[in-house]
Design a protein with these regions (language model features):
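Adenylate-forming
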Residues: 168, 183, 201-230, 259-267
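ATP-dependent adenylate-forming carboxylate-activation enzymes
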Residues: 1-11, 17, 36-40, 220-225
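Short secondary-structure boundary segments
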Residues: 20
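Gly/Ser/Thr-rich phosphate-binding loop
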Residues: 14-17, 29-139, 152, 235-236
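Conserved ATP-binding/catalytic segment of the ANL
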Residues: 147-214
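Short, charged/polar, Gly/Pro-enriched secondary-structure boundary elements
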Residues: 139-140, 256-261
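C-terminal boundary motif of the adenylate-forming
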Residues: 193, 232-258
Length: 267
């Protein structure tokens, strides 16, 4: 794990699958280097990413990208994106996937702004791995995609994600009780909370056991909020609490090296 980012750069893969933690680490690496960069490099980065975000947002909304933005994005690719992607080991990436845990939309949008074709997948071992995935041209930064062929996905009354397909397992070995809890009438109960949006995309909220509820009954996902907070290069860790309380509270650990450099510059 310590050399994963270095290994990716050496290999230069065309297809990559990695957990959100690795992609988040790459994002943080870029943000820290941005803070250490010269004034001119920071301005080039800011301009390139600003244009990249505009193009990515239009593509997310399935709207045409104006010719002038395509031209500017091409210039940004030559001046900034190409070198940055090479540094991250993503210069040859055609398809990048992530899954296994929630990924913050900020990180997801960041890679699409760099023209990295990152897609999310959702599934579990009991359904042979993948049941839902983003398709090219149908990517939304806050979802995990749509079901693969011959797979049905529904949401129960209490918000749990359930799936049915020919690849659903028959049960746990010598554990009939657990099998009965997980498999009901051919439907696989995931233990995850979520919903299906108007475009048929699945939105995963969090593990049911990890979802907390405010005193007024409103649910929230601590992991989702923690991931959003840690998108900042100044925050190394975040811990969100608020179950049965009137409001949500976040306890944060700052990144001393990054904050220290910022403080020196602001003297």
């Amino acid at each position: 794990p310590e050399t994963a980012q270095e290994n990716i750069r050496e290999i230069g893969p065309h297809v990559m699958f990695a957990p959100p933690r690795l992609y988040e680490g790459l994002t943080r690496q870029v943000q820290v280097k941005y803070i250490d960069a010269t004034w001119i490099k920071r301005k080039i980065y800011e301009l390139g990413t600003r244009i990249g975000y505009k193009v990515a947002n239009l593509e997310f909304e399935k709207e045409p990208v104006p010719a002038h933005l395509k031209l500017l994005n091409g210039i940004g690719h030559l001046l900034m994106q190409k070198k940055l992607k090479d540094h991250l080991g993503m210069s040859r990436i055609r398809h990048a996937y992530t899954g296994g845990a929630a990924m913050g939309p900020d990180h997801f949008r960041f890679f699409h702004a760099l023209d990295v074709n990152l897609k999310q997948i959702y599934g579990q071992t009991e359904i042979a791995g993948i049941s839902v995935v983003h398709r090219d041209g149908d990517v939304k930064f806050d979802t995990v995609g749509t079901p693969i062929p011959e797979t049905e996905v529904k949401i129960t009354e209490d918000g749990e994600i359930i799936s049915k397909s020919p690849s659903v397992f028959l049960g746990y070995y010598k554990n009939e009780e657990a099998s009965k809890e997980t498999l009901v009438d051919g439907w696989l109960y995931s233990g995850d909370k979520g919903f299906i949006d108007e475009d048929g995309h699945l939105v995963v909220f969090d593990r049911s056991k990890d979802v907390m509820t405010l005193s007024d009954g409103r649910p929230f996902s601590p992991q989702y909020l923690e991931t959003r907070l840690k998108f900042s290069p100044y925050i190394s860790e975040a811990w969100v609490i608020g179950d049965k309380r009137d409001y949500v509270t976040a306890v944060m650990c700052i990144d001393y090296s990054v904050v220290g450099k910022w403080a020196d510059e602001k003297k």
